């Protein structure tokens, strides 16, 4: 087995010249360096159809670099251009798992799984970043994620060879798949089988923690153990088995539905699931789609729903879906309201009685603050929507069946507010889920319906499905 792995490693290390040079993206991407191009080509060869003995001997399976790039863009829900552009490089630079991407909640070739339901694991060594008890707790929780939804049982042993051997290492660490230093590749695991099969390795050049600082060991371990049990990567950005690392927050972790479906395909359900409702990723063309918040941001449109947001570029039809915490780890998972203040290059995010001011990826110092700082009485517990008008300096806030008007210049609430929504904007109903303004029209979202409202004529001019904002 070890000699076979060694032979495979040498084949992977030898890269024949079958690939095509990477084309650049738009004119705005002309500043891509030679280092960017080398990095991108290495990324694509590592995670999209890595060279294997079968692939080398059978030339019909050879995949060009451009084909790999298109597959990578499709996998991550990017616009499939076949060109190396900034959004594609942004994804490539994110910390991730070292296992190649194949798609959905499929399994490794030959549908590898454990034949038994009672499995053992051993923690071979420890990271110096955390206490032994913290490391043990992280792995115990990670195994429980999978045992909660399957008939699998995991028992820790302290010596000898376990089904799943867990270790920390750096660079070359004994399996011929070296780590790359801080960030980048965080960990990898092998599918079920003998020898290395099932083993999980963690890069000790990373800073491992039990919080949002560095990399959360529990989150990475739970992902890698999915591979140890036979799962491949998922295209679903909300899935635990999505290849990119995202800190999911301090709240109780619930295994997403995509992962549940995958692991139960292999092993079946467990006796009693403590979390019978598992979070699902929203589907943009769902006819019943409702939204949580909408805002512009530097020419793009950000559309928030549950733990996610769609990022809609003005020149693209396909919206990109991301976990909110993959961009802003410090924000809550769910957003109540959001708006952009373009002249200040700020985006404001609201959740409950708190709000945040963001400049790009960065939260401004002094935030979060309380919405009472804006002049809301204590009876207002949360906002449902917000929209800013740059030409007047006014911001409208919606809460339950009322609308408030805030003067950004004087930083006070306008007199004669709040007012009833249905009186201020006749015909849109008495609640607003999300709202944004564009070219003299206000777009109000209420459940699966959106209203296009003319500011000049003060009336509804069109009624459309909510999902039409996502080109459905």
Curated annotation (Swiss-Prot):
Q: Which CDD domains match?
A: HX, ZnMc_MMP
Which tissues is this protein detected in according to the database?
A: Detected in epidermal cells and stromal fibroblasts in wounded skin, but not in normal skin (at protein level). Detected in embryonic hypertrophic chondrocytes and newly recruited bone cells at primary ossification centers. After adult bone fracture, detected in periosteum and in chondrocytes in the cartilage. Detected in immature and mature osteoblasts in the fracture callus. Detected in calvaria from neonates. Detected in wounded skin, but not in normal skin.
Q: Which free-text remark accompanies the cofactor?
A: Can bind about 5 Ca(2+) ions per subunit. Binds 2 Zn(2+) ions per subunit.
Positions annotated to bind Ca(2+) 3: 180-181, 183, 185, 203, 206
Organism per entry: Mus musculus
Any one Gene Ontology cellular component term annotated for this protein: extracellular region
Enumerate the subcellular locations listed in this protein's record, separating them with semicolons.
Answer: Secreted, Extracellular space, Extracellular matrix; Secreted
Domain remarks? The conserved cysteine present in the cysteine-switch motif binds the catalytic zinc ion, thus inhibiting the enzyme. The dissociation of the cysteine from the zinc ion upon the activation-peptide release activates the enzyme. The C-terminal region binds to collagen.
What is the primary gene name for this protein?
A: Mmp13
Give residue ranges of the Hemopexin repeats.
Answer: 282-331, 332-378, 380-428, 429-472
Catalytic residues (positions):
224
Q: What cofactor is needed?
A: Ca(2+); Zn(2+)
The protein's name: Collagenase 3
One example GO MF annotation: zinc ion binding
- In this chain, Ca(2+) 2 is annotated as bound at 163, 195, 197, 199
Superkingdom: Eukaryota
Q: Which InterPro entries match?
A: Hemopexin-like_dom, Hemopexin-like_dom_sf, Hemopexin-like_repeat, Hemopexin_CS, M10A_MMP, MetalloPept_cat_dom_sf, Pept_M10_metallopeptidase, Pept_M10A
Q: Quote the record's binding site residues for Zn(2+) 2.
A: 97, 223, 227, 233, 241
Q: What does the record give as EC number? A: 3.4.24.-
């Amino acid at each position: 087995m070890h000699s076979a792995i060694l032979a495979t490693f040498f084949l992977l290390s030898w890269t024949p010249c079958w690939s095509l040079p990477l084309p650049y993206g738009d004119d705005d991407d002309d500043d891509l360096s030679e280092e960017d191009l080398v990095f991108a080509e290495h990324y694509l060869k590592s995670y999209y159809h890595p060279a294997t003995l079968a692939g080398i001997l059978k030339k019909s399976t050879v995949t060009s670099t451009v084909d790999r790039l298109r597959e990578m863009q499709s996998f991550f829900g990017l616009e499939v251009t076949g060109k190396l552009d900034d959004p594609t490089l942004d994804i490539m630079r994110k910390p991730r798992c070292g296992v190649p991407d194949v798609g959905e909640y499929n399994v490794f070739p030959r549908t590898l799984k454990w034949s038994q339901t009672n499995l053992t694991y051993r923690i071979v060594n420890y990271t110096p970043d955390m206490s032994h008890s913290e490391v043990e707790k992280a792995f115990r929780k990670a195994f429980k994620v999978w045992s909660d939804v399957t008939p699998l049982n995991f028992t820790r042993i302290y010596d000898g060879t376990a089904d799943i051997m867990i270790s920390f290492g750096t660079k070359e660490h004994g399996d011929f798949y070296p780590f790359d230093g801080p960030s980048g590749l965080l960990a990898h695991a092998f599918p079920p089988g003998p020898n290395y099969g099932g083993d999980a390795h963690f890069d000790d050049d990373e800073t491992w923690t039990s919080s949002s600082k560095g990399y959360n060991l529990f989150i990475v371990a739970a992902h890698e153990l999915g591979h140890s049990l036979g799962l491949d990567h998922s295209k679903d950005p909300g899935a635990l088995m999505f290849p990119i690392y995202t800190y999911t927050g301090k709240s109780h972790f619930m295994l997403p539905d995509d992962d549940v479906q995958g692991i139960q395909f292999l092993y079946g359900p467990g006796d009693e699931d403590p979390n019978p409702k598992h979070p699902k990723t929203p589907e943009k063309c769902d006819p019943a789609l409702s939204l949580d918040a909408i805002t512009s941001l530097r020419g793009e449109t950000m559309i928030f729903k549950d733990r996610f947001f769609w990022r809609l570029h003005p020149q693209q039809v396909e919206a990109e879906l991301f976990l909110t915490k993959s961009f802003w780890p410090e924000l809550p998972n769910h957003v109540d309201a959001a708006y952009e203040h373009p002249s200040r290059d700020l985006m404001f995010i609201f959740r409950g009685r708190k709000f945040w001011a963001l400049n790009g990826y960065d939260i401004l110092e002094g935030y979060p603050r309380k919405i009472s700082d804006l002049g809301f009485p204590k009876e207002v517990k949360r906002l449902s929507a917000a929209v800013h008008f740059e030409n007047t300096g006014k911001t409208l806030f919606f809460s339950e069946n009322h609308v408030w008007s805030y003067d950004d210049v004087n930083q006070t609430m306008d007199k004669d507010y709040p007012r009833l929504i249905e009186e201020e904007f006749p015909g849109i109903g008495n609640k607003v889920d999300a709202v944004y303004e564009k070219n003299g029209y206000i777009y109000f979202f209420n459940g699966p319906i959106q209203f296009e409202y003319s500011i000049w004529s003060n009336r509804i001019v069109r009624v459309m499905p909510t999902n039409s904002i996502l080109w459905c």
